[in-house]
């Protein structure tokens, strides 16, 4: 029977066998992977994660085994799923895209190493002590697209130069406040007014987009939020129906009919989470691994959508695109 580090959910101590020592006796370490959505939602992300993990010498079914847990969109299930992984005595927990899950893990699990992916400021949310020296047992990646709002606003201004008002779709329950603050400044700098559209559920999406069309506001900036990403095809379709010129934060919107996107590479983000997981399995300490942000940004353009909207994409914009859908 494999000897493992026993870890109590209520803050108990670990029988501190280094993972490298245990790996010599039985090479199959166990990683718990907790997704906030369904497994199918993570297909491409998981591939990228495993590519990053393999870079460090760990392959599923060989050097490492996996315990997968899926919340199926029910964030309130995350604490239960985390408890289950602790009972399974995993060596590492990966929370690739849930701020709520990461905060719960921080509170519940004081010793098992945790790699997170979040859109929140990790210091302000209490996940780590600092970006460079996280302290504790958590580290990971931050996918914050708020800093790119001015660039997206500028893109909208280039596409609809005569517009005086820009719509901003945000979820006030998540990262909406940050998007609004940055968006207001970006709009002012371009001499534009900002029309804020608050959306907290999928039922609000068609109402918000219809409201913008009723007010004859054509440019739309879709904020960074998991709710919008899950319903990206619906949002892209509604925007097209209302003849809105919309800019998004991820290329996946463009691949399902959205006009244009600019943001961090999502697959690169998950690949780096895999690299960090591997480094920790090699006994590096989360406390010493700086919280990272993506370094690669990409633009995607759907020319078919542009034609349907009657929008001309400037050559200067086309020249910088990483993906162009004809």
Stretches with model-predicted labels:
Residues 1-326:
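Short hydrophobic alpha-helices and adjacent helix-cap/hinge residues
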């Amino acid at each position: 029977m494999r000897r493992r580090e026993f870890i109590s959910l209520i803050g108990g101590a670990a029988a501190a066998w280094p993972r490298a020592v245990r790996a010599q006796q039985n090479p199959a370490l166990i990683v718990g992977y907790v997704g906030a959505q369904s497994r199918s939602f993570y297909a491409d992300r998981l591939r990228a994660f495993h590519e990053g993990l393999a870079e460090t010498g760990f392959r599923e079914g060989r050097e490492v085994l996996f315990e997968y847990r899926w919340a199926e969109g029910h964030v309130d299930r995350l604490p239960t799923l985390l408890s289950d992984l602790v009972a399974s005595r995993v060596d590492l927990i990966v929370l690739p895209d849930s701020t709520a899950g990461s905060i719960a893990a921080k509170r519940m699990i004081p010793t098992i190493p945790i790699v997170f992916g979040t859109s929140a400021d990790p210091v302000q949310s209490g996940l780590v002590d600092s970006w460079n020296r996280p302290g504790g047992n958590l580290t990971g990646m931050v996918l914050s697209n708020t800093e790119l709002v001015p660039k997206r606003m500028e893109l909208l201004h280039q596409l609809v130069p005569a517009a005086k008002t820009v719509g901003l779709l945000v979820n006030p329950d998540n990262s909406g406040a940050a998007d609004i603050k940055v968006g207001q400044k970006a709009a002012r700098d371009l001499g534009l007014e900002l029309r804020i559209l608050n959306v907290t559920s999928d039922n609000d999406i068609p109402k918000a987009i219809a409201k913008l069309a009723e007010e004859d506001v054509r440019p739309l900036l879709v904020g960074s939020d998991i709710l919008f990403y899950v319903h990206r095809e619906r949002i892209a379709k509604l925007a097209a129906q209302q003849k809105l010129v919309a800019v998004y934060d991820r290329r996946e919107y463009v691949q399902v009919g959205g006009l244009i996107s600019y943001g961090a590479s999502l697959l690169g983000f998950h690949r780096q989470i895999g690299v960090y997981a591997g480094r920790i399995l090699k006994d590096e300490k989360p406390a010493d691994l700086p919280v990272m942000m993506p370094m690669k940004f990409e633009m995607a353009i759907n020319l078919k959508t542009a034609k349907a909207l009657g929008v001309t994409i400037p050559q200067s914009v086309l020249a910088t695109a990483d993906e162009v859908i004809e």
